[in-house]
From Swiss-Prot:
<feature type="glycosylation site" description="N-linked (GlcNAc...) asparagine">
    <location>
        <position position="499"/>
    </location>
</feature>
<dbReference type="InterPro" id="IPR048534">
    <property type="entry name" value="Man2a1-like_dom"/>
</dbReference>
<dbReference type="InterPro" id="IPR050843">
    <property type="entry name" value="Glycosyl_Hydrlase_38"/>
</dbReference>
<dbReference type="Pfam" id="PF07748">
    <property type="entry name" value="Glyco_hydro_38C"/>
</dbReference>
<keyword id="KW-0862">Zinc</keyword>
<dbReference type="GO" id="GO:0030246">
    <property type="term" value="F:carbohydrate binding"/>
</dbReference>
<feature type="glycosylation site" description="N-linked (GlcNAc...) asparagine">
    <location>
        <position position="134"/>
    </location>
</feature>
<dbReference type="Pfam" id="PF09261">
    <property type="entry name" value="Alpha-mann_mid"/>
</dbReference>
<feature type="compositionally biased region" description="Low complexity">
    <location>
        <begin position="1"/>
        <end position="10"/>
    </location>
</feature>
<comment type="function">
    <text>Necessary for the catabolism of N-linked carbohydrates released during glycoprotein turnover.</text>
</comment>
<dbReference type="InterPro" id="IPR011330">
    <property type="entry name" value="Glyco_hydro/deAcase_b/a-brl"/>
</dbReference>
<feature type="glycosylation site" description="N-linked (GlcNAc...) asparagine">
    <location>
        <position position="543"/>
    </location>
</feature>
<feature type="signal peptide">
    <location>
        <begin position="1"/>
        <end position="50"/>
    </location>
</feature>
<feature type="active site" description="Nucleophile">
    <location>
        <position position="197"/>
    </location>
</feature>
<dbReference type="GO" id="GO:0004559">
    <property type="term" value="F:alpha-mannosidase activity"/>
</dbReference>
<feature type="binding site">
    <location>
        <position position="73"/>
    </location>
    <ligand>
        <name>Zn(2+)</name>
    </ligand>
</feature>
<feature type="glycosylation site" description="N-linked (GlcNAc...) asparagine">
    <location>
        <position position="690"/>
    </location>
</feature>
Amino acid sequence: MGADARPLGVRAGGGGRGAARPGTSSRALPPPLPPLSFLLLLLAAPGARAAGYETCPMVHPDMLNVHLVAHTHDDVGWLKTVDQYFYGIHNDVQHAGVQYILDSVISSLLVEPTRRFIYVEIAFFSRWWHQQTNATQEVVRDLVRQGRLEFANGGWVMNDEAATHYGAIIDQMTLGLRFLEDTFGKDGRPRVAWHIDPFGHSREQASLFAQMGFDGLFFGRLDYQDKRVREENLGLEQVWRASASLKPPAADLFTSVLPNIYNPPEKLCWDTLCADKPFVEDRRSPEYNAEELVNYFLQLATAQGQHFRTNHTIMTMGSDFQYENANMWFRNLDRLIQLVNAQQQANGSRVNVLYSTPACYLWELNKANLTWSVKQDDFFPYADGPHQFWSGYFSSRPALKRYERLSYNFLQVCNQLEALAGPAANVGPYGSGDSAPLNQAMAVLQHHDAVSGTSKQHVADDYARQLAAGWDPCEVLLSNALARLSGSKEDFTYCRNLNVSVCPLSQTAKNFQVTIYNPLGRKIDWMVRLPVSKHGFVVRDPNGTVVPSDVVILPSSDGQELLFPASVPALGFSIYSVSQVPGQRPHAHKPQPRSQRPWSRVLAIQNEHIRARFDPDTGLLVEMENLDQNLLLPVRQAFYWYNASVGNNLSTQVSGAYIFRPNQEKPLMVSHWAQTRLVKTPLVQEVHQNFSAWCSQVVRLYRGQRHLELEWTVGPIPVGDGWGKEIISRFDTVLETKGLFYTDSNGREILERRRDYRPTWKLNQTETVAGNYYPVNSRIYIRDGNMQLTVLTDRSQGGSSLRDGSMELMVHRRLLKDDGRGVGEALLEDGLGRWVRGRHLVLLDKVRTAATGHRLQAEKEVLTPQVVLAPGGGAPYHLKVAPRKQFSGLRRELPPSVHLLTLARWDQKTLLLRLEHQFAVGEDSGNLSSPVTLDLTDLFSAFTITYLQETTLVANQLRASASRLKWTPNTGPTPLPSPSRLDPATITLQPMEIRTFLASVQWEEHG
């Protein structure tokens, strides 16, 4: 079905080929579950074995085996909210009810023992499971044991791969796979990753899947040029070498591209949402079509098989929210299998068709013992036509993208304090604290229509609602934990609106205390900014010593903020006290308009490490200097906008939530000059730039800071002229970059990008802007032989280098047309999402030392300190223990190359611990890219580790007993992985290695 003729609620290229518009066809109710006695009798039949490859069906080694995969693709929010999809509400928007799909599938599987089905989205399945009776649950467990109901992927959602951070990916996969492990044991453990709908595929995602223990990956969306080449060269299946640092085969993943995205073949969609004809076998009927369908299928299977290297091929039989009447699907598949296989006897057909699963198909490929080609880059950007690059969603809904990243930060703080404080965090003086709601909400946000920004507006609003609801019980947990660890029960306040300078307590109280929690494994020095009233203030550190402070008037406001530097220990907190000075009005530092006097035309800000100079005529940044490394780089930064395409003579494709398609290659400047104001205090220097009524920026240097901070504010983007606009921040330099630039992959490893180039095929570039855009999750940089300019982001954005020495990041977009990919509404964001604030951190370094700066600063950007306020004067938590104003959960800091990725409660007496080497091989010219050894025995101060078990990345298998299928790449044999030592709690981390542990602990009595 083409992009301009698809049923409502079907993404172009996605589900529902041949589907009728929902709501227009009559549909039978799914059959009820058979009586329990019948089910138990059926399941007691001989031949039921433990789930695993041994439960796979028999194949014919001398025939073409067509593996039919019955499946449903259930978006965890898209056109409807998660709840609306589960319960089947608002079927006028899209006919979809997940609870009925699962009811119907289970019922139909029990009718015929050869039938198989896979399910993916655990966010839905877990909800359905908890609504079932014990008897039904046992029936399902038996189906899983027999391999007839099989889970693929197993994450809470099928996450996006462009706008997601690797930590959040790991968390959501852990949540879903833990449910399966707790519910079904090893029988329910998925063996393949199933990412059939994400709009492009990242290398880091493949690396994580390999480290999670998956044997292979199946996906559906592949660039149309890439797919054509792979079909011709039999390259749809290969080994993906997904890490440049981890030794093969640690991050090697067998990868298979599905032949029809994830849809059934043309004419073979037998769902109530489809309009294809069912099998009619009665030759007397004028509708008789059985012979025609069988012949069509044989031709189809033979043609498809020619694109693959073995005598096995796979067909997906299902699509978006299908199988609500599973009997309709399975009855026709039964007939297809019977009639096609009958041709083997009737006329010597060499095609064998069978119910199968992706895992069973993969098993047959593995047994073929072939040598496979190797891929080492990624699958971005994705295009499904010459002018249809799916690179717009890298930047869509920037406010939601930032809220998701903030929530990841807060969830890690919540998890850590729950681990450090022990059971007291969950039940304490502030009520019942719980990290689970935010963990689940964050998992939902990783869905490929959530953080991607590709849902309807009301669904995006619901995603934000889920996050907000998850923050509440985490705040209770933080209060309980901080009270226990500090020894003082305070009236804690959480100011969620500090980004817009709103915090009622700090703006009204004469005295208050500020608790700053540091989630990193090293001490940090951090500048605190709090909105305050028009008074003078004195700030004291945990020892009672007065620390420097400033009051700064806010731009475009009569409000003001208090600034003071805080030092916070590793994995711990410091409590500072703030007091008004009676009778003293503040000496507030107001922004000063730039002088027009000829002898004062230098506009610059500077600290000990960085100097930034601005053009006094235009107000634009024009030069950056690293004083420590004696580097000076002319760099011009300004805001531009692309005029969004509404279609032209080359293509009717418009820019939308998914698609980025500008009208012209050259963007327009928001303004050629900025009205500027200068702020200089002992703690901070700022240049406030006002480009227009809807675009402004503060360029900032704090004392001691080694990067330049650009805090931009964009919106509401004006569209009254009838043009959608896509706003970028662009940096132009004199660096000779030779068409190269570099972006991160999900916040971890770095990939080299070359303009107008793809490593695995000769690109025919049809969109010189959109076709060169890539996801930027945490950083983008350009460099020559000496200097490197890096920009760190505070959320996922799209970015590129469209000419040598230049790089750009898209910060916001507002569009007037729907791009024809199923959402059915333009990306207008008429609510608060129109006004967005964010930060870019700019680093200038020598190439050989740049990694130290951007790695350590990016870590700080993802896990920033959590600020909690209180009036002070709280009651003691322990009557016999004095309160403390400083605490560290570590007895010694982690080395700079080691990141504490996860510290979270697993059960009542067990913690989940992940430690990560955050540098790549050869990335640092010093020793930060070297292996590092840690002793975990007495590392933590709040608890003692009594027993330690190492697991796979998602903690669903012991590492020592986990195994994966072995493949032979054409690069030569890979060495057997050497076992990682744990002796008894001393571990070594190799570059880019993550090691995961379940630690039995005993908490200290008073923390």
